[in-house]
Amino acid sequence: MRWWRVAAILSIGVGLGLGWNAFSGRGFALDKNAFLRPGEALVEISAAETKTRLEKGALVLDARGLDFYKLAHIPGSYSLPEEDFERAFAALEPRLRGTADIVVYCAGYGCEASHNVVRKLAQKGVYAVILNEGWPAWQDAGFAEKEGDLP
């Protein structure tokens, strides 16, 4: 096989991979700080810091799917699933725009949903931090949990 054919096949493969990554909505984050204000980066906080902020009036958002939210979630948190972001954002927008301190969490340990939701929020002018290691960190800390579809 000639070198140019190898280069062409490789180029097509890379192009298709990058295209899939860019448009699938579930691709790998090539730049985890995309769509944030200049000079800002994704900020992660601990479960203890999340609890402190929640007690001071922070809004906590669960980026997991609604079924997981109903099984158990942080008391007072609202469901904002990554896969249903636009609909859920529209319902929560007035509350989000009126809150300065927002924390987002997901299933933790490699889950990118909270990162993706924070980026989508930033695109809409709403800025949030991430609960590092998400729901498992909250559970491991022994903090309260709530079942059902209400905060």
Question: What is each residue range found by the language model?
Answer:
Residues E93-Q139:
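Catalytic cysteine-centered active loop of the rhodanese-like fold, especially the PTP/DSP P-loop
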Residues P38-V104, G108-G110:
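Positively charged, proline/Ser/Thr-rich regional signature most characteristic
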Residues A72, D140-A141:
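Short Asp/Glu-rich motifs
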Residues M1-L71, P151:
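Flexible, polar/low-complexity N-terminal or interdomain linker segments that lie immediately upstream
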Residues L59, Y127, A144:
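Residue-level detector of anion-binding/catalytic polar loops
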Residues G142-P151:
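Active-site neighborhoods of enzymes that stabilize oxyanions during catalysis
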